[in-house]
């Protein structure tokens, strides 16, 4: 979805990459190592994201602890990036609502796909074992709230049929809702 919008001229802020940068910040790195142990640091002192992921996706409490450390910093970095220029931007964020980033949006395009499609994609993209992929899918449960629960317009797009169908549906939605640049 983000790539399709970027092709249409939208500025894309990849919130996952913002999180990677936050984990390289000394204060966040120290808090993460203090909470999850020195085993989450690589030999060069950086956060080993694969090891950290392995640990936090085992329980909701561990994931919540990590989110408590990094999400506030990520939100601040996103705000800083948005302030750089007034041009419209896309926030590409799997947990947009959980982070409260929806409050910065005028509209949300929520991409849906069956869990087994998302699982296969995550395993292929990230090289995850089946159990790891299932834990990640479970952690993302409920990331798109009901239409009436959010303070922003939410538009759902199905991504279960491949990139061509996603592109067609996205462009149609942008035209219909007047969201084109």
Question: Could you describe each region identified by the protein language model?
Answer:
Residues 17-86:
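ATP-dependent small-molecule kinase phosphotransfer cores
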